[in-house]
């Protein structure tokens, strides 16, 4: 075997070593601090491989079909956390089952949350008086558009909310929110 001469072996001085160590430590700390920030802006999708977002109740717990139907009667419209965290109405239909669609509760006028008025049997916006029928179709302005629709599916008792991209059955037009 041949020996390398001292001219062929690179040497690292003390200053160069300390600079490398300082840079490595600072980089590690910066990446460690950025990890939670990145997770905040890119959260994992809930719901699994079938797509959709798990509907969550007011405490942030996933909504189950059996639990929801045990506490809600036919005709009930109650809020859950749906797509993108928006308030979304789950509808219990006349057969006592969770409906196939949900309604985004954000008013299309100025973005207020629109409550369900069971006495008037419609959604009435408290901000400027816009009114929507039982299916979320605007019946009185100033809101220019109907409430956005979302698919509601039940997968193994879990209630999932999915993006609605088909024709809006209330207006027979392409959805404005897609």
Swiss-Prot record:
Keyword entries, A-Z: 2Fe-2S, Disulfide bond, Electron transport, Iron, Iron-sulfur, Membrane, Metal-binding, Thylakoid, Translocase, Transmembrane, Transmembrane helix, Transport
Superkingdom assignment: Bacteria
Residue intervals of the Rieske domain: 65-161
Catalysed reactions, semicolon-separated: 2 oxidized [plastocyanin] + a plastoquinol + 2 H(+)(in) = 2 reduced [plastocyanin] + a plastoquinone + 4 H(+)(out)
Subcellular location: Cellular thylakoid membrane
One of the GO BP terms on file: photosynthesis
InterPro entries: Cyt_b6_f_Rieske (IPR023960), Rieske_2Fe-2S (IPR017941), Rieske_2Fe-2S_sf (IPR036922), Rieske_Fe-S_prot (IPR014349), Rieske_Fe-S_prot_C (IPR005805), TAT_signal (IPR006311)
Residues that span the membrane, as ranges: 20-42
Membrane topology of this protein: Single-pass membrane protein
EC number: 7.1.1.6
UniProt cofactor note: Binds 1 [2Fe-2S] cluster per subunit.
GO CC, one annotated term: plasma membrane-derived thylakoid membrane
Binding residues for [2Fe-2S] cluster: 107, 109, 125, 128
GO molecular function, a single term: oxidoreductase activity, acting on paired donors, with incorporation or reduction of molecular oxygen
Signal peptide residue numbers: none
UniProt cofactor(s): [2Fe-2S] cluster
Disulfide bonds: 112-127
Family statement: Belongs to the Rieske iron-sulfur protein family.
HAMAP family the UniProt entry points to: Cytb6_f_Rieske
Miscellaneous comment text of the record: The Rieske iron-sulfur protein is a high potential 2Fe-2S protein.
Assembly mode: The 4 large subunits of the cytochrome b6-f complex are cytochrome b6, subunit IV (17 kDa polypeptide, PetD), cytochrome f and the Rieske protein, while the 4 small subunits are PetG, PetL, PetM and PetN. The complex functions as a dimer.
Function: Component of the cytochrome b6-f complex, which mediates electron transfer between photosystem II (PSII) and photosystem I (PSI), cyclic electron flow around PSI, and state transitions.
NCBIfam families: Cytb6fFeSPetC, PRK13474.1
Protein name according to UniProt: Cytochrome b6-f complex iron-sulfur subunit
Name of the gene: petC
């Amino acid at each position: 075997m041949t020996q390398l001469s001292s001219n062929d072996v690179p040497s690292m001085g003390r200053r160069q070593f300390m600079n490398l160590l300082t840079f490595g430590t600072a980089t590690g700390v910066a990446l460690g601090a950025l990890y939670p920030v990145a997770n905040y802006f890119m959260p994992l999708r809930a719901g699994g491989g079938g797509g959709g977002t798990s509907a969550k109740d007011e405490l942030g717990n996933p909504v189950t079909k059996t639990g929801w139907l045990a506490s809600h009667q036919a005709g009930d419209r109650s809020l859950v956390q749906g797509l993108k965290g928006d308030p979304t109405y789950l509808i219990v239909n006349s057969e006592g089952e969770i409906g196939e669609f949900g309604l985004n509760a954000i008013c299309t006028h100025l973005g207020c949350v629109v409550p369900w008025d069971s006495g008037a049997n419609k959604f009435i916006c408290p901000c400027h008086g816009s009114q929507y029928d039982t299916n979320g179709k605007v019946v009185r302005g100033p809101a220019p558009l109907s409430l956005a629709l979302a698919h509601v599916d039940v997968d193994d008792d879990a209630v999932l909310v999915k993006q609605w991209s088909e024709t809006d059955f209330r207006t027979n037009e392409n959805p404005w929110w897609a």
